């Protein structure tokens, strides 16, 4: 028998044998056994792998922002396309509805992709799942990029659904993959890169949409065609990245391959301490069957799953996508004219990138933790919404120019607060509180909830805003007040802690 075969057989046997002894797991996906993973450094291979993995995050952010600027142009094109396709006139109202469907179906695809991501990640691996996910991106790029040439607007709608599937997969896969390849002391920093690339991509898409770049009647298809670039780049580079060693050990039972991948990521031959910790976690996870979707809401998994869902709801029900999607409308309401709202929106995107970059550093800083940054961010957003309502009320009643400028400042404060913690932390927080056996399903459920809340806010905000005007932001104030209390009362600190230590915190906070 070869050395490789003996190693893999040994790892698999240890998983099998462990089921014959008393379990250190009371429920699948949880452990009472203390497993400590060592700290490490940012190596060239780890940095390269993180860059390649987060190209999928860029795709996610790009398609959040790329529909804003060309919306009016595409609506006009839909009217002409409908006439050519069906030889019938389409009213402006129905053209607006068709474009709204194209925008909203992105979130529907995201929900489906997010819910399916755990199955795909466990079936073909984290790296394999990203590979197949890029095929969806290429199909979507072809549909949306060629729609104008073909003259068929349903291609845009179908393309948005497919790219939504792609982004749903990546919004679960990327944080999970980053968390699994990171050393203990860099989990937060590398996990935050997902949100950083999302914010960078939103900014890039906003810049591309400017009228003197791609935001014209002839060039808007190029905005969607750009989807090909990160997809092809990731496809070309993925094979140079090691597979997740935790996945390879826990799901495939291949210790030899896991050790080889870990040596590349850590740039050292001595990975014995970390590989033994992975073996212990894999052995513990193998004691009982891998938890199914329904098991995630039972026993010891119920409490962490509930908190993971609440963290995703806190992110979306904070109103951040209202600030992002309708920022131009908000800035016009605050008194900006001409092209000023568009440039203000780009400025807001730049602030979001800068603050997210700072949060990447803060999240693993000795003086801060996940919980403290979440509380600080949610509190800042709560205060910002109250102040924004006050400024808009004064401005709408004929107040001085200072009220308009104050409203803009409060929107920026809102975005800064979001980037401090609620923007990045929920994405990798889910992977920190579950072991390898439950991580895929936990991410699937949490990401599906995130996308569902995204869709809910997107569909309901404009009707509510038409009814309540600036006072509609009080709804988000209420949500934020609740999530501040919930985070303070129930959410544990996870920085630098093992799964066992985190689960002990869960028990304290029940």
Curated annotation (Swiss-Prot):
> Where does the entry say this protein is expressed, by tissue?
Isoform a is expressed in pharyngeal muscle and intestinal cells in both embryos and adults (at protein level).
Q: What happens when the gene is disrupted?
A: RNAi-mediated knockdown of the protein causes reduced 2-deoxy-D-glucose uptake, glucose oxidation and glucose conversion to triglyceride; simultaneous knockout of daf-2 or age-1 causes further reductions. The lifespan in low glucose environment is extended by 20-25% after knockdown, with 7% extension in daf-2 mutant background and no significant extension in age-1 mutant background. Fat accumulation in intestinal cells is increased. Brood size and dauer formation are not affected.
GO CC terms, sorted = basolateral plasma membrane; membrane
Native source species = Caenorhabditis elegans
Q: Which family does this protein fall into?
A: Belongs to the major facilitator superfamily. Sugar transporter (TC 2.A.1.1) family. Glucose transporter subfamily.
Tell me where it resides.
Cell membrane
Role according to the record: Facilitative glucose transporter that plays a role in glucose metabolism and regulation of longevity. May also play a role in lipid metabolism. Glucose transport activity of isoform a is competitively inhibited by mannose, galactose and fructose, suggesting ability to transport also other hexose sugars.
The segments annotated as topological domain Extracellular are 68-100, 147-160, 217-219, 321-341, 395-409, 465-470
Entries under InterPro entries matching the protein: GLUT, MFS_dom, MFS_sugar_transport-like, MFS_trans_sf, Sugar/inositol_transpt, Sugar_transporter_CS
Protein name listed in UniProt: Facilitated glucose transporter protein 1
